[in-house]
Amino acid sequence: MPAGGRAGSLKDPDVAELFFKDDPEKLFSDLREIGHGSFGAVYFARDVRNSEVVAIKKMSYSGKQSNEKWQDIIKEVRFLQKLRHPNTIQYRGCYLREHTAWLVMEYCLGSASDLLEVHKKPLQEVEIAAVTHGALQGLAYLHSHNMIHRDVKAGNILLSEPGLVKLGDFGSASIMAPANSFVGTPYWMAPEVILAMDEGQYDGKVDVWSLGITCIELAERKPPLFNMNAMSALYHIAQNESPVLQSGHWSEYFRNFVDSCLQKIPQDRPTSEVLLKHRFVLRERPPTVIMDLIQRTKDAVRELDNLQYRKMKKILFQEAPNGPGAEAPEEEEEAEPYMHRAGTLTSLESSHSVPSMSISASSQSSSVNSLADASDNEEEEEEEEEEEEEEEGPEAREMAMMQEGEHTVTSHSSIIHRLPGSDNLYDDPYQPEITPSPLQPPAAPAPTSTTSSARRRAYCRNRDHFATIRTASLVSRQIQEHEQDSALREQLSGYKRMRRQHQKQLLALESRLRGEREEHSARLQRELEAQRAGFGAEAEKLARRHQAIGEKEARAAQAEERKFQQHILGQQKKELAALLEAQKRTYKLRKEQLKEELQENPSTPKREKAEWLLRQKEQLQQCQAEEEAGLLRRQRQYFELQCRQYKRKMLLARHSLDQDLLREDLNKKQTQKDLECALLLRQHEATRELELRQLQAVQRTRAELTRLQHQTELGNQLEYNKRREQELRQKHAAQVRQQPKSLKVRAGQRPPGLPLPIPGALGPPNTGTPIEQQPCSPGQEAVLDQRMLGEEEEAVGERRILGKEGATLEPKQQRILGEESGAPSPSPQKHGSLVDEEVWGLPEEIEELRVPSLVPQERSIVGQEEAGTWSLWGKEDESLLDEEFELGWVQGPALTPVPEEEEEEEEGAPIGTPRDPGDGCPSPDIPPEPPPTHLRPCPASQLPGLLSHGLLAGLSFAVGSSSGLLPLLLLLLLPLLAAQGGGGLQAALLALEVGLVGLGASYLLLCTALHLPSSLFLLLAQGTALGAVLGLSWRRGLMGVPLGLGAAWLLAWPGLALPLVAMAAGGRWVRQQGPRVRRGISRLWLRVLLRLSPMAFRALQGCGAVGDRGLFALYPKTNKDGFRSRLPVPGPRRRNPRTTQHPLALLARVWVLCKGWNWRLARASQGLASHLPPWAIHTLASWGLLRGERPTRIPRLLPRSQRQLGPPASRQPLPGTLAGRRSRTRQSRALPPWR
C-alpha cells in the first residue's frame, strides 16, 4: 500500500491479494477468547467447512495511527505467507471485517510459559533441551531466509497436539536483515536492539540472545531483571554483564549453551545453525518428552480446575441457606483469591510472562481497540446475561462461573463434540465425578429455575470443548491483567513515540542545519568564484596590454633596425662612389704619365710601347679592383658588426622590457593571491562560527530532549511505584482475608521463646497494653490489619522493586519519589515489622529478602521521614536482625507461622511429577544458609616474610664465596619470589621450570650450535645470573641479597682496607657528583637514541631503554609548569658561564670563522676580477681560476613597499636612434660588466 493510502484500502492489487473476500463470521463459529496480549485478543474457533479447529488473532486498524496499524498488519500477513516449516505456526488466511483483521492460524495447546504457570516449577533439563531444539530449528529456518523474529520468549514458543514446538507471534518480525528498529519485549531484548536507535543495525543473532534468556526463563520461571521496571531493565541489559544461570544443579552443557547464546558482543555470539550442533540439544533424550510434558500438564490443569470447582461449590453450597444477605459479597470476596491462586505467578508482574508485551508499533497500536471492535455482539450478550444474573442473585452467578470452569476442565484430552439436544450439564461422560462432601446438603435450597437457567447459559457457552493446557482461571486472569496493563502498554508506546519524535526532531534539525551549511558554502563559493573571475579578467586585460606593448616595441625595433641598416648602406655607397671617382682620376693621371714616359723614349718600337702600356693599364686596373674589393669587404664587415651590436642593444632593451612586464604581472598575481587568501581566511572564520553555532544548537537540543526523556522515565518509574503499591495492598488484603479467624484472635499474643521487643528497635512500638485489651471497633480492626499487612510491606516492596535504581537516585529524586508514592516512608522503628511481614510471603520472596543478600546500596537507603531526613541501617538493627533470623522465624504483629503443607494445600498446588534438585529447584532438605558473620580481619603474620628474607640473605652469603654458584642462586631466587608474590607452590614450580629450561636452551644454543667453550659459557652464565639476581632483588626490595653477596666477597679477600677506603672516597664523590654525571650520561644516551631510525628507537623504547623522565629532562619545555606535552620541543640549554667550553663547541666556532674568511675571500676575488683587463680574465679563465657567471632566468621580485601596480615608467630612446621619431623618450641602460 502506498504511504499516502487509507487504512483498509484494497485498491493496490498487491495488498488485495493478501486478504480473502469471504465473511469470516460465516466461515468460523464458536469463537471463544483464549488469550490476550498487547496486540488484542486470540480466539478459539471452528471452521464450518471442514470442522478444523483454528486460532484467530483479531487486530483492529481503526482509531489513532490507523495507517501504522494497517502497515503492521500487512507486514505480518506477508511474513506469515512466506513461512513453510514444521517449527513455525501454519498460516490459514486473513479476512477483513469492520476495520478488524482476522488472522487465522493453526491452533496450538499453549505456550511454554503456560507450562511454568501450571506446574509452578522450572522444567526439567531434558524438557528445556527439547523445547529449545524445536525453537532453534524454526529460528534457523527464519535466519536462512534473512528473517528476524525479534520477540522470542516462552510465551511465543507454542506446543501443538502432536508434540511439535512452533514459533508464533510474528507481529514484531522483520523480513529484511539487518534491521535497526527498537522492537521486542524489554526483558528478552538483546543489547544491540536496545542501542539500535543510536548505534546501528543488527541481524538474526538478536534471536539467539532472546533464546538464551528464554532458557533462563524456563530454568528459573522468570527472565533476569524481571522484578525490575521495564525501562530500568533496558538500561541494565545494555550496560551490565550478560546474565547466567543462578542455580548450580544444571549440567555444564546447559550452562555452556546459555553462555554462548548470551555473548554481549554480537560477533562472538554463534548463529542458530551453529547452535543446532551443540551437545546440549543433540544429547540423547526420550522421543516422547514433549508429549509426556503435555500430558502431565493436562492432568495438572484438570486437577487444578477440579480443585477450584470443589472449593467454589463448597463455598456456594455452605452459604446458600443464608440467602442473598449481607454475607454474600463477603464470601464472593473470599472466593475471589481462589480464582487467582490457581494460576498465580510468584513473580511480581505475571503480565510480562504470558501475554506478548511487545514494543512494536503493531502491538502498541492494536492493543487498545481490539476488544471493542472485535467482540461487540459478545459484549451485548454478556451484558444481557449479567442483568439476568443480577436479578437472579449471587448464587446463580457463582454457579454459572463454577460450571463454566467445570466445562473447561473436562476437555483436555481430546476435542469433544456434544449433541445440541442435551440440556443437562452432567450428561457429559467426560465431566469429572463430583462426590458430595459430608458437609454438603443433599439438595441446595436455591431456586431450581435459577440453577437450571445458569446451567443452560453455561452449556450454550461451552457446548463444544477444545484441548488446551491453560486453566480457566488463567484465561480470565489474562483478560483482567490485559485491562490493568493497558496503561503500562500505553506508557511504553508513549515512550517509544517520544523517542521517535525526538529522533525525528534531531533529524529535522540536522537536515535544516545541513541546508544552512550548504547554502553558506554555496554563497561563499559564489563569492570566491566571482573574485577569481574578476582576477582572471584583470589578468587577461594586463596580458593583452603587455602583448600590445611587446608587439609595438617589436615593430618599432624592426623599423629602427631597417633605418639603421639603410643609413649604414647609404654611407657605404657614398664611400664606394668616392673611391671609384678617385680611382678614375688616378687612372687618368697614370695613363698620362705612362704616355709621357713613352714619348720620352722614341727608340722603343711602337708595338712594344703598346704592349707595355697595356700591361701597365691592366696592373693599374687590378690594383683598383683589389682596392675596391677591400673596401667592399671592410664595408660588409662593418655593416655586419654594426648590425650585431644594434641587435644586441635591441635584445637587451627587449629583455629589460619583458622583465618589467613580467615583474608587473607577478606583482599583480601576488596581490590577487593575497586578496584571495584574505577572503578564504574570512570565509573560514565565518564557516567556523556557523558550525560552532550549529553544534551549540544541536547540543542544546540534545540536552533538552535528554532532559525530557529523563523526566518521562522518572514519571514512568513513579507511576510504576504507585501501581506496585496498589498491587501490594490488594495482595496483603487478600492474605489477611485468607488467614483463619483464630490468627486474628491471637494477633496480640507473643509466640513462646522470643524476648520482649526493645522500645525503639525493630517491630511495632510497644505501648504497654496488650493488643487484645486495647479497645477497637471492627472497622478499626480492619484498618489495623490493612495497615500492618499493607502499608508496612509497601515500603519493602518498593525497596525491592527499585533495587539498585532506588539506591542510585539522588536525594532530591528520592524525596520526589517518596512524595509521589502517596504514603510516608516508614521510620526506623518499623524496620522489624517490614522484615517480619516480608518473611511471611512466598519462599522465593523470603530468599530474596534475606538481609545478607542485600547489597550495600539497597541496605543503606531504607526510608524517608516526613521531615525529609534519611535514616540508615545501624549496627544495632543489624544485630537484632541477625538474632531474629538465627531463631528460624521472626515475630509478626498479626500473623503466626503457617506450616508449609497448609500453604500448599490452600494455594492449590498441582498434582504432577515431583521436581528434584537436579532440575534446578532448591532442595527442601538443605537448610537455609545462615547469615555471614562480620569478622574483623586479623593482622597478617610477618613471620613468613622474615623467614624468606633471612633465607635469601643466607643463600646470598653462601653463594658469594663461590661465583660458580650464582646460577644456582638465581634458580632458587626465582621460585621464592614467585611464591612470595602470591602464586603459591604452582607458581614456584613454574618459575623453577622456566629457569631450568632457559639455562638448558642457552647451553644448547651457545655450546652445541655455536661451539662456545664451556669456561666462557660458565663465565657468561655467572655474569647473567649476577645481573638477574641484583635486578630481581632491587625490583622486589630484597636488600639482603646484594648485601650478602658483597659481605661474602669482602670476607673472601683479606687485603681490602685500601680498596674500601678508595670505595668510600669514590662513594662520596658519586654522592656529590652522581646526579650531574647521571644527567649527562642520560642526555648523551638519549641523543644517541634519537639519532637512530624510528623502528630501532621504538624497539628500544618498548624494551624500557627510553623513559618519559629522561625525555622530559632532555626537552624541558614539554614539562613546563606541570604540563606534559606529547610532542617534545627542544628548549634552550642553560649553561653555566663559569664552566669551561666544550671541545666540540670550540671546533664549531673554528668552523664558523673558516666559513666567514672563505666568503670574504670570494667577494674580494670577484671585485678584483671586475677590474682586470680582458686578456688577463681570459688567461685566468683558461687556467681554471675564474669562471663566467651565468645570468639567472628567474626575475627578481621587488619588496611589497616598492611594487608598482601601474604601467612601467617611460624609457629614454636608445643611443643611435633619431630623437624626433618617438613621442616618448627611453632611458639607456648600462651593459652589465663581464664576469
Curated annotation (Swiss-Prot):
This is Serine/threonine-protein kinase TAO2. It comes from Homo sapiens. It holds the Pfam family Pkinase. Residues 486-547, 574-601, 681-713 form a coiled coil. Keywords: ATP-binding, Cell projection, Coiled coil, Cytoplasm, Cytoplasmic vesicle, Cytoskeleton, Kinase, Magnesium, Membrane, Nucleotide-binding, Nucleus, Phosphoprotein, Serine/threonine-protein kinase, Transferase, Transmembrane, Transmembrane helix. Its cofactor is Mg(2+). Residues 318-457, 732-777, 804-835, 891-939, 1198-1235 are annotated as: Disordered. Signal peptide: none annotated. Residues 924-934 have a biased composition (Pro residues). InterPro entries: Kinase-like_dom_sf, Prot_kinase_dom, Protein_kinase_ATP_BS, Ser/Thr_kinase_AS, TAO_STE20_kinase. Changing K57A: Loss of kinase activity. In isoform 1, excluded from the nucleus. No effect on microtubule-binding. Serine/threonine-protein kinase involved in different processes such as membrane blebbing and apoptotic bodies formation DNA damage response and MAPK14/p38 MAPK stress-activated MAPK cascade. Phosphorylates itself, MBP, activated MAPK8, MAP2K3, MAP2K6 and tubulins. Activates the MAPK14/p38 MAPK signaling pathway through the specific activation and phosphorylation of the upstream MAP2K3 and MAP2K6 kinases. It catalyses: L-seryl-[protein] + ATP = O-phospho-L-seryl-[protein] + ADP + H(+); L-threonyl-[protein] + ATP = O-phospho-L-threonyl-[protein] + ADP + H(+). Interacts with MAP2K3 and MAP2K6. Self-associates. Interacts with tubulins through the C-terminal domain. Interacts with MAP3K7 and interferes with MAP3K7-binding to CHUK and thus prevents NF-kappa-B activation. Isoform 2 interacts with PCDH8; this complex may also include CDH2. Residues 375-393, 899-908 have a biased composition (Acidic residues).
